[in-house]
Amino acid sequence: MQNLKVDESWGNACRQIVQAGQRMDQRGWVPATAGNLSCRLPDGRIAITRSGGHKGFLTDSDVIEITPDGVPVDPANRASAETLLHTQLYAHDPAIGAVLHGHSVAATILSMDEPSDAITLAGYEVLKVFEGQTTHDTSLELPLFHNDQDIARLATVVAPKLSDMRLGYLIRGHGVYVWGKDMFTALARLEGLEFLLACELARLQKKA
């Protein structure tokens, strides 16, 4: 019976990741093989998309198990190079149950053009999708970090600011990282953030 419960738990995790990948692909947030998705199971195991898979066509076999340090449990599997950014979040907050990373047009362009170290989002009703926000009459900052192929080094830059992040964070010329207590919450936060970034991009284009 215990093994059946374990298998069911893993199957649910795979299903959530596959469905979220399809949703992100439909929205154009994970072009080609970009992006990665993960979730933490009730027993503490971490499921994440394997490296190189198209997120719009994921199957259960495209989801692999990793240790809390980001090492594939099965040595034959290859995890994304950015796996460390997922495990960093899980280690930072035990309440985090899912992490999503996408590469949308709006996130990419805005992150490359913003001169400061954060994008400020203010006055939007959709800000209320984020925990603790009860009004549109507020502003939240989305931290920006320079892209770095050395993921361990990038993680050390991100780490000091994690506790203050309300929206997620954005890597310049790359994409966003968002998370939530479960996959539904993480996906809602991602959709809310991508909507806000699309609005900001449209406003800039209107001014041009």
Curated annotation (Swiss-Prot):
Reaction(s) the record says it catalyses: 5-(methylsulfanyl)-D-ribulose 1-phosphate = 5-methylsulfanyl-2,3-dioxopentyl phosphate + H2O
Which EC numbers characterise this protein's activity in its record? 4.2.1.109
Pathway participation: Amino-acid biosynthesis; L-methionine biosynthesis via salvage pathway; L-methionine from S-methyl-5-thio-alpha-D-ribose 1-phosphate: step 2/6
Task: Report the top EC class in one word.
Answer: lyase
Write out the GO MF terms: aldehyde-lyase activity; methylthioribulose 1-phosphate dehydratase activity; zinc ion binding
Keywords annotated in UniProt: Amino-acid biosynthesis, Lyase, Metal-binding, Methionine biosynthesis, Zinc
What residues form the membrane-spanning segments?
Answer: none
Q: Domain of life here?
A: Bacteria
Pfam family of the protein (one): Aldolase_II
Which biological process annotations from GO are given for this protein? L-methionine salvage from methylthioadenosine; pentose catabolic process
Which NCBIfam families would you find in this protein's record? Answer: PRK09220.1, salvage_mtnB
Annotated function: Catalyzes the dehydration of methylthioribulose-1-phosphate (MTRu-1-P) into 2,3-diketo-5-methylthiopentyl-1-phosphate (DK-MTP-1-P).
Q: Which family does it belong to?
A: Belongs to the aldolase class II family. MtnB subfamily.
Q: What is this protein called?
A: Methylthioribulose-1-phosphate dehydratase
Organism whose genome encodes this protein: Gluconobacter oxydans (strain 621H) (Gluconobacter suboxydans)
Q: What is the lineage of its organism?
A: Bacteria, Pseudomonadati, Pseudomonadota, Alphaproteobacteria, Acetobacterales
Which gene does this sequence derive from?
A: mtnB
